[in-house]
């Protein structure tokens, strides 16, 4: 198949629409559904991310994409009881495989943003992964293969219209890529930089020069995630998964704040009072996610006001005070942070420190690098200048 006709482009008025190959066959097979233009943009960007994560770490990888940027990305490390609970996978009746764990982490880190996502899996989608996917609101999945059991489960999702794409894992695109804007063709070499190259962590200008193996893995995960995130972008990572991604901001500090706030929410979801909220029986997953997000945030009265809390809880829970939130967030440590370009000011490090960041990888090259280094030294943060910019547009 050289081309595939689509219903429309980015918007319903943008017709006709198709994907096609100028040379050779499309490296995909649609096994279920009818993916759209944006679905394919998410699918092909997310597939590159998980393929590179698998190559770099040797671990199964998964990503959750929305509007051509990742909401989550992770490798297949086992879930502890706390993460299984906050990702709502503690009730699964069969053991979770490594690829299922990767998906649970990628989907679970920022559940609000992942609602209606497109999923990418580096490895064959098995039954456990398909069972997790089936219960979530999602547009589709791309993977190199599917077991028969998994495919049967996915084909039942959304009354048989769920988008399932199989991609040839051996496919490699041409070294030159092109796109058109306003009728003008842009051409560039593909971004083939290897982000697991040990040389990226050789230029360490900070007093603390120690990067444990886990931190290096997490920084590689952050950098690969940023490679496929709309710029400007910043990514916080802990224990093999992105916990906060700030994408598409014109200001670097706003990226760092946005991603840091997401990381804080991820950590606050593990607070005992949040994990034990007395939800009414049968509450929908999306309503539970939204209620938790409001309860943690500044607008908690939206779900705690008289006449409102009864819709969500069997009894009215006491909100967390600002002091309680700060005390809990202060317990989060060992976080790694990647940036797709240099930090122009030390304020990014100040904000990152508040969310438990102890390791940073960024391009370096700012006229104020000395200020950024001094701020890292102030908190004992280890920072590497990679010399690699990762803009993505």
Task: Describe each PLM feature range.
Residues 56-57, 111-114, 227-229, 329-332, ...:
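A structural signal for short secondary-structure junctions
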Residues 69, 125, 238-241, 343, ...:
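Active-site-proximal loop/turn and secondary-structure-junction residues that shape catalytic pockets
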Residues 22-34, 109-115, 188-209, 286-309, ...:
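Gly-rich Lys/Arg/Thr-decorated short loops/hinges at beta-loop-alpha junctions or inter-strand turns
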Residues 52, 228, 265-269, 354:
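Conserved helix-loop functional segments at active or binding sites
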Residues 1-199, 215-233:
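Active-site loops and adjacent core secondary-structure elements that bind or stabilize anionic groups
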Residues 56-64, 164-167, 231-238, 268-279, ...:
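Flexible, glycine/charged-enriched surface loops at secondary-structure junctions
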Residues 71-111, 243-342:
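Glycine- and Gly-Pro-enriched alpha-helical subdomains that act as flexible
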Residues 121-122, 135-165, 170-172, 188-189, ...:
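C-terminal binding/interaction regions
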